[in-house]
Amino acid sequence: MCLTPTDRSASRTRLELFVGNTLAFVGLVLCLAGTASEARAEAKTTAPAETVQALFVSDIHFDPFIDPAKIPLLAEANPSEWAKVLAAAPSVDRSARYAAIQKTCPTRGEDTSYALLNSSLQAIRKEAVGARFATISGDLLAHSFDCKYRAAFPHAAPGDYRAFVEKTLTFVVDELRAALPGVPVYVALGNNDSDCGDYKLNAHSEFLATIGEELTKGFPASERAGAKETFAAGGYMSVRLPAPLRNARLLVLDDLFMSAKYTTCGGKPDASAAEAELAWLEQQLTVARGSHEKVWVMAHIPPGVDVYSSAKHLDEVCGAKGPKMFLASEKLAEVLARFGDVVRLAIFAHTHMDEVRILQPENAGNSPSAANGMPVKMVSSISPINGNAPSFTVARVDPETAVLKDYRVIAASNATGLDTVWHEEYDWAKAYHEPDFSAASVGKEVAGFESDAAQKMEESRDYISDFYVGASPLLGLIWPQYVCALRNDSAQAFKACVCPMGK
């Protein structure tokens, strides 16, 4: 409160009155200025923190074999020359020759052509123009990549296939870097991103060392050597997220080694690489907890239940076999769930769908991670192979807390990349009326889904519609079973949720 003299003695001289009133006026001005300054300071501290933009891309599945006449040219060219080759007019017999490759190497549909890749990059330039960093959460290479290569080069020399894989990966990453100049691009490998076939990879390989050299370009010098070393060992690495994010770190995993389908290039199962990676992850999270770092974790294959495969065999889920799981064990989910106080976001992909999940420890007691758990964002695909519309995600992040505040899914009007219009599919905050994508907010939405088996809530209907980007709401047919997987990441918990008591 500002006080001014109001009671003046009648005997005071005019000079005294002038001086007194002047001083009172000055005091009033200074007081009001101080009050305004305090108000501005208070407003500054209570106003919502300014967010920064980030880009999430996944499952690009770029197919360089779509015009077979160009494949020998690509094999001879450097990745920096690929765009010129791919942009040239298609060969006259392109369709017939590619159909022959598809017959030899059948897939569900077609992956990402150069036209679609180029269209998506143009949309990214427009929609993510302010991005401070970008993530690619795996599967840069087309499905049946190794089969298509052998069909194109039946007499290829040893090592040629690996060289072509390395060139393709480099080309795709460099194209995204060119679309967002100066923006760090962080990449996790997926099950297709291998020099020896789908779900096959050797730890401590020359392939991982070569790709690690490429993917760590632009990393801070103080961190690049360590990142290259761990990536060469098992496809995992640690890097500090860029300013203006503060004291925030990204841990990138190659959880192909943890997959239920994983084998070495020689076709043998081997759990040692997964065990080493999980030990590294736990050590990194322990250090981060001690130094009060905020962590994001990114990998390709999510932990938990493969709902699509499990829903086709519900009798097995409720029987002795149990549900189909994405990973060979539940150790990744268990490690992550123990560090819910450290990890602000986990990014996965693999299903090609737009999904959310939450990881919560089943027996956490009073541990720091018990309160809310960990939010999981599963990024939808650029590839339209499942009939979905190509899409990517533009996110907003709180630089102080590293919490994902909001995101928008941007989808294509067609799968060809020709005359394609990209539009906003939905906005998380607007669709679900949540202040952020924190564990508390995601947990609240999941709880709502769990209570809405009949799909009467607007949020449930929105999720069903947005899950299969641009396509029909088929998820509604298995909605109760699907919802069981959003929180119940262990086989036992999922089975208890889905199956009637006692069966």
Go through each PLM region and give its residues.
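N-terminal secretory signal peptides that target proteins for export/translocation
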Residues: 1-17
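Bacterial N-terminal signal peptides
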Residues: 20-34
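Signal peptide processing junction and immediate N-terminal pro/mature segment
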Residues: 32-43
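Metal-dependent phosphoesterase/phosphodiesterase active-site architecture
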Residues: 42-136, 207-291, 334, 353-503
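Active-site neighborhood of phospho(di)ester-bond hydrolases with catalytic His/Asp-centered motifs
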Residues: 56-58, 132-139, 181-191, 297-300, ...
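Active-site environment of divalent metal-dependent phosphoester hydrolases
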Residues: 63-64, 142-145, 187-198, 259-261, ...
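Core catalytic region of metal-dependent phosphoesterases/phosphodiesterases
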Residues: 79-95, 99-199
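Active-site-proximal segments of metal-dependent phosphoesterases and phosphodiesterases across multiple
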Residues: 260, 265-278, 286-343
